[in-house]
């Protein structure tokens, strides 16, 4: 039985494109205007800081010799395909799940582009309190985390809200 793509969660793929444009645009601006390691204070506790991440979150496996680039690229592709299939199986009206999946796909594809094009992921958001700095991250990472948080939130909502 075929169904109109507009009636499925794939209707929300426009959000993937928005995340990609914002993420890749921010990384382009950093690459054009910052030297590696440059820092510009924005607000108390928030800097723009150009860093390269050769691993995953928190630079996991960053010093592993290069194989991790392809490993994490494969994970990004696999997760994106799985979530796109899940979106296809969902109704377009199931907003929370579709938004969550679209944010995760957009973030995964943004970081995938960096891995394949540059060989590293461009990070630039430096949050700190006093002398303690959180791991530097980017807007793709933010989209992935917000998407994951929405999935957790959806799990706590009453079942009637889930069916919409």
From Swiss-Prot:
| PROSITE patterns (UniProt xref) | SPASE_II
What GO molecular function terms would the record report? aspartic-type endopeptidase activity
Q: What is the recorded membrane topology of this protein? A: Multi-pass membrane protein
* Active site per the UniProt annotation: 123, 141
Question: Has UniProt tagged this entry with the keyword Flavoprotein?
Answer: no
What is the top EC class of this enzyme, as a single word? hydrolase
Transmembrane domains' residue ranges: 12-32, 70-90, 102-122, 137-157
Name the GO terms of the biological process aspect.
proteolysis
Which InterPro entries does the entry mention?
Peptidase_A8
Which Gene Ontology cellular component terms are annotated? Answer: plasma membrane
**Where is it located?**
Cell inner membrane
Q: Coiled coil where?
A: none
Q: Which reaction does it catalyse?
A: Release of signal peptides from bacterial membrane prolipoproteins. Hydrolyzes -Xaa-Yaa-Zaa-|-(S,diacylglyceryl)Cys-, in which Xaa is hydrophobic (preferably Leu), and Yaa (Ala or Ser) and Zaa (Gly or Ala) have small, neutral side chains
EC no. given is 3.4.23.36
| Top-level taxon of origin | Bacteria
Any keyword Transferase? no
Question: What keywords is this UniProt entry annotated with?
Answer: Aspartyl protease, Cell inner membrane, Cell membrane, Hydrolase, Membrane, Protease, Transmembrane, Transmembrane helix
Alphabetical list of Pfam families matching this protein: Peptidase_A8 (PF01252)
- Pathway listed: Protein modification; lipoprotein biosynthesis (signal peptide cleavage)
Q: Function, please?
A: This protein specifically catalyzes the removal of signal peptides from prolipoproteins.
Q: Which family does it belong to?
A: Belongs to the peptidase A8 family.
Q: What is this protein called?
A: Lipoprotein signal peptidase
Gene source species:
Shigella boydii serotype 4 (strain Sb227)
